Amino acid sequence: MGFLYIDGHVRAYHGKHTISQTFVARRHLAMPATTDYWINDRAGDPLLLITGELDASLTKAFPDLLREVRAAVGERQVTIVFDRGGWSPKLFRSMIRQGFDLLTCRKGKTRRIAERRFVHRRAKLDGHWVSYDLHDQPVRLLGGKLRLRQITRLCEDGDHQTQIITSRWDLRDIELAYRMFERWREENYFKYMPEEFLLDALVDYRIDPQDPTHTVPNPQRRALDKQIRTARADLADLERQYGAAAADNSEQHRPTMRGFKIAYGKLGQQLRTARERLRKLLDQRRQLPKRVEVRDLSEQTLVKLATERKHLTDLIKMLAYQAESDLMNFLRPHYPRAEQEGRTLLHELFATAGDIHVTEDELQITLAPLSSPHRTRAVQILCELLDQTATVFPGTRLRLRFAVRPPPLIGLAFPGTPAHRGAASAPSRPRNRTF
């Protein structure tokens, strides 16, 4: 549990109640939604789940998340891995003071590093070889008060560079880069669970009242921010035009500034109008508070979805996923394509018909063959491994015994070996009969 991955997962809401809006990245728009923050281990398996408060960004959710992590792991030193959504040097300093290490990607523009300064690294991690072109250096944030380590990866195209920030000085740069880019495991979890376990399903219709005094960013100010960005872009474009006209002005035709202003009076008027518009927008924004209370946003009562049943069903789904992952670990050494289709094989196994026979001390389960011989053989090995666990059926003293009926030697789905096919297709010889 040396590395824990934290990220938010947004659940869109399509019901009739009025709940807060959240930006849903996969739909590229803001809509009624709830954000759940998941904490996964380095294999991508879930450990903890916290439902975020109204309009809580990852940086604002971190204090609660860290308290839950500390309660779960005790005083052990763990490294928290997260994306740019949690970028905050002040947060980093607070995490380090609480005994956590951090690993994240740097946000914002940084100076490009010369390609010749990168070093090729190659190592075997988690059983497979990885290689990166890396540059390692110390950096200072918060005006030099916070010293961290920056590892930059040069991508294969030779153009893009990714900066990784960490407080870990004891590990090799290639291992830290590998752990950072292993975030795809958590992303895969967010993709897999809604499809296979209905993670985003609405499990009940209960609602809880939202705290009316809770503050959120002022939507009017947010709308003004958009207008100000547009006004600044328009002003910058007019200033470029006016500057270009001044640079190209011929002194033989217009030797004085007065003549230039008269000649470009229309453009000058547009420039002054744009400046005045920007000034008014900035004045309007200064008069608006940055945050407002929820009760001031709408006449409708803002509510939030109840979490008790949702968390209970999520817990059951987490356990089911963990059991599936444990079966994957049993299967992996005996099924070459386990990473690509191992879970698909397990889904077929779960839906396979079978026979149940009860004896005095055993519950014997014999499954039908799967869709292909190589899958059937893999499941046979899995059954043997499960038998070795000596698992007892809950509430009884019956030991579970698993088996798979062997596939038929000949058939459309199981054509058998060439020898079997030859034997089956060979004409039968007449038998000698004695009288």
Protein language model features and the residues they cover:
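Active-site-proximal, Lys/Arg-enriched surface segment
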Residues: M1-I39
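Short, conserved catalytic/metal-binding motifs centered on acidic residues
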Residues: G2-R11, G44, Q77-W87, L102, ...
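Electropositive, glycine- and tryptophan-enriched low-complexity nucleic-acid-binding patches
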Residues: V24-V73, Q161-T162
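An anionic, glycine-rich sequence signature occurring as long contiguous blocks
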Residues: T51, R93, R97-Y189, P194, ...
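Domain-level cores of phosphate- or acyl-group-handling catalytic modules
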Residues: A56-S57, A61-I113
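Charged, amphipathic alpha-helical linkers/stalks
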Residues: Y189-S250
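Extended alpha-helical coiled-coil "stalk/arm" regions
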Residues: D234, L238-V292
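C-terminal accessory/interaction regions of large nucleic acid-associated machines
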Residues: T273-R275, K280-F435
